[in-house]
Regions:
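Terminal targeting signals and extreme-terminal segments of soluble enzymes
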Residues: 1-158
Length: 158
């Protein structure tokens, strides 16, 4: 299932659609998340609980692997937004070359509490971007704004 993009603004729409195209078809399609970032400063992804994403069927909580995956994607999305700002106005070939380099090289996830809920929001922002790597911070909350997990991701950018 293709990744849905629900954003406002022409630039944000362009970068989010490009990110969605790069991320599909792949494992990301299994998660069936939507990109709902409201600015080029923070990545926001939404994910709904489905049976195939449950880790513990007795308590119906989100699987830990799903949590780490959505946080990793959110972190990469924040980096993608940041790099997109740097290459705005450049030819598409230059954009693709720079944006295509983004890849996870390290990921740390802290599970704060079980992934209870029906709707989840992953947010991410940039901690640092250098010439070779970028670091982002991510959080996952449920629909009641309960913090489920936090993460820090390191990504190649150069």
């Amino acid at each position: 299932m293709p990744i849905k993009v629900k954003v406002k603004g022409e630039e944000l729409q362009e970068v989010s659609e490009h990110f969605a195209k790069l991320a599909s078809p792949s494992f990301n399609d299994v998660l069936n998340f939507s990109i709902e970032s409201q600015s080029l400063e923070e990545g926001t992804l939404k994910l709904d609980l489905r049976d195939e994403l449950i880790g513990n069927p007795i308590f119906r909580v989100l699987h830990g692997g799903v949590i780490s995956s959505i946080l990793d994607i959110a972190g990469a999305h924040a980096v993608y937004l940041y790099i997109f700002k740097q290459v705005m106005g450049k030819p598409i070939e230059k954009k693709m070359e720079r944006l295509g380099r983004i890849s996870t090289i390290d990921l740390r996830i802290d599970y704060i509490r079980p992934g209870k809920g029906q709707h989840f929001t992953a947010t991410s922002n940039i901690l640092r971007v250098g010439s070779k790597i970028a670091v982002s911070r991510m959080e996952l909350h449920n629909e009641d704004n309960v913090l489920i997990a936090v993460g820090t991701g390191t990504y190649t950018v150069g």
